[in-house]
């Protein structure tokens, strides 16, 4: 199913890599043409098209190894390559996980009446289709373009749904950080070109500076360097498309890093990436375990899992590609499992609990890949501390997941039995897909990984028990201490400086408008004439 050991091939055979995205774009067109229909009809169409796309992607697993060139144009002075989608094992696994999340969101939409607008319903397949293209990006040119398009699309959506002016600085901060990462990717291409190498296909970029810039761009988008934890609170973007916007970007980054560093991180980058992984695992894990609202705490969940994945890759360089790929799968599937699981019946608690078991390293799951790497780290030279930090990160993530599973039960928002059944299928699908993908991954099962999983699981249970028994005042104190690590005050200060500069420029520019502009133009002309006269012989 996963074709984990199939070698990469970038031969331009057929356009298989574009098929899932094309299906999603067609879905958006169909939904737009049916925009005046009732919500039930729109839900049925979107769910049917999502299921069809999901099955098509599943069938494409036999074609792993092909690639698709999307253009004749190439910027030879910098990238010397065309737009390229690589349908390798990493890309297929990520695409399958992303489409599983998309299908789950489509199935559960009917259980959230009124929460999905027509614009959101149409944008969901468009955003997912562009995300698939970014996951399959085979070179730096494709990464730069797809990242920039996704950033712009996200910015437009967030600005359209926010009703709180205080949230705008956070949205612009997110756009600025992501834009800086795109510039860093362009810098990686420039460094590669200046060194005399023109090949920007991932896996074949050997320039140390270029590799370092690619890794740095990934860390920026993961929120590790510099730290930028979250988007502002957007009540209309908690679930649905909000889930996609928070889970897709880090998975895209991990797909790129897995493709570039499949054979291991360069020696020069290992200390830097280990430090970033430790920051993500510890800070992200602590903030996630202390999060009062799991939905608003998703950025810390992403930061913790991404940091833990980087630590695991540093422990076991021989499996870097598989580790980073499965880290992205965990972010998508486990993140979707708790993001969509509103507890309406006791049976619904099963899926968040199962997701917690997966994320702490259960065998035969993507989490087992990380647990196995950490188990090997305890026996390696100089890697025991990385394994220990990884165990702390997994335990903290599990603690936060258990807290979400025991959240209070709420009433059904809708009474139709079919909607309830489909909703149960939708929230359980990511967990079942994670189990199926883990069963096909050889690195997901090892004796050491099982032992590590038991230890991390016990630590997560103990952490949850301690959090439950801890007085509320102490929890608030812990959140207050942890929030001091939040760099948002610095970003707010930078925003105020930016606004002050704009206000100054506006004040200076106002006299140049209207009649004042004509007067100033006369003054400029007189000064020029005086200058010419003073230089005349």
Task: Pin down the residues of each PLM region.
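Transmembrane helix-loop-helix hairpins at membrane boundaries of multipass inner-membrane proteins
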Residues: 2-18, 27-115, 121-122, 473-476, ...
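Central hydrophobic cores of alpha-helical transmembrane segments in multi-pass inner-membrane proteins
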Residues: 16-34, 45-60, 76-80, 95-111, ...
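Aromatic-capped, Gly/Pro-kinked transmembrane alpha-helices
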Residues: 441-447, 468-537
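Predominantly late transmembrane helices and immediately cytosolic-facing juxtamembrane segments
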Residues: 224, 325-351, 358, 381-428, ...
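Alpha-helical multi-pass transmembrane bundles of energy-transducing inner-membrane proteins
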Residues: 34-41, 121-209, 220-223, 288-352
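Short helix-boundary/re-entrant hairpin motifs in multi-pass inner-membrane proteins
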Residues: 76, 213-272, 292, 299, ...
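Hydrophobic membrane-spanning alpha-helices of multi-pass integral membrane proteins
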Residues: 250-251, 352-364, 392-398, 418-436, ...
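Alpha-helical transmembrane segments
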Residues: 141-149, 178-179, 204-218, 273-280, ...
């Amino acid at each position: 199913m996963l074709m984990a050991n199939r070698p990469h091939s970038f031969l331009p055979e057929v356009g298989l890599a574009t098929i899932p995205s094309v299906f999603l774009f067609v879905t958006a067109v169909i939904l737009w043409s049916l925009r005046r229909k009732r919500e039930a009809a729109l839900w049925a169409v979107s769910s049917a098209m999502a299921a069809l796309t999901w099955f098509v992607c599943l069938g494409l697993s036999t074609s792993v190894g092909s690639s698709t060139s999307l253009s004749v144009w190439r910027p030879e002075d910098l990238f010397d390559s065309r737009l390229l989608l690589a349908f390798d094992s990493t890309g297929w696994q990520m695409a399958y996980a992303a489409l599983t999340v998309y299908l789950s969101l489509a199935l559960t939409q009917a259980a959230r009446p009124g929460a999905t607008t027509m614009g959101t319903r149409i944008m969901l397949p468009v955003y997912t289709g562009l995300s698939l293209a970014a996951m399959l990006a085979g070179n730096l040119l494709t990464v730069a373009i797809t990242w920039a398009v996704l950033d712009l699309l996200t910015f437009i959506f967030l600005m359209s749904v926010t009703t709180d002016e205080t949230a705008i600085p956070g949205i612009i901060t997110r756009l600025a950080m992501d834009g800086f990462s795109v510039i860093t990717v362009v810098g990686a291409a420039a460094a590669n070109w200046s060194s005399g190498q023109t090949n920007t296909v991932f896996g074949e970029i050997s320039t140390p500076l270029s590799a370092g810039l690619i890794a740095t761009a990934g860390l920026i988008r993961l929120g590790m360097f510099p730290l930028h934890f979250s988007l502002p609170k957007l009540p209309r973007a908690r679930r649905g498309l909000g889930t996609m916007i928070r889970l897709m970007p880090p998975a895209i980054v991990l797909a790129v890093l897995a493709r570039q560093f499949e054979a291991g991180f360069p020696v020069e980058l290992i200390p830097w990436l280990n430090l970033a992984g430790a920051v993500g695992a510890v800070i992200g894990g602590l903030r996630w375990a202390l999060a009062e609202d799991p939905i608003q705490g998703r950025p810390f969940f992403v930061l913790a899992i991404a940091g833990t994945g980087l630590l695991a890759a540093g422990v076991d360089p021989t499996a870097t590609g598989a580790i980073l790929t499965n880290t992205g799968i965990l972010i998508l599937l486990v993140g979707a499992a708790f993001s969509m699981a509103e507890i309406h019946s006791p049976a619904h608690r099963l899926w968040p609990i199962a997701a917690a078991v997966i994320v702490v390293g259960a065998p035969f799951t993507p989490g087992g890949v990380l647990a196995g790497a950490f188990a090997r780290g305890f026996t390696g030279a100089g890697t025991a501390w990385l394994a220990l930090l990884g165990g702390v990160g997994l335990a903290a993530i599990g603690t936060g997941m258990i807290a979400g599973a025991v959240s209070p039960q709420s009433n059904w928002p809708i009474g139709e039995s079919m909607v309830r059944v489909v909703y149960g299928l939708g929230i359980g699908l990511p967990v079942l897909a994670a189990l199926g993908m883990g069963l096909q991954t050889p690195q997901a099962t090892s004796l050491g990984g099982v032992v590590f999983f038991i230890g991390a699981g016990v630590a997560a249970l103990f952490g949850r028990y301690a959090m439950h028994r801890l007085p509320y005042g102490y929890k608030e104190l812990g959140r207050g201490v942890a929030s001091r690590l939040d760099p948002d005050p610095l970003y707010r200060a930078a925003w105020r400086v930016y606004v002050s500069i704009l206000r100054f420029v506006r004040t200076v520019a106002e006299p140049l408008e209207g009649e004042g502009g004509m007067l100033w133009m006369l003054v400029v002309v007189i000064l020029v004439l005086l200058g010419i006269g003073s230089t005349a012989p």
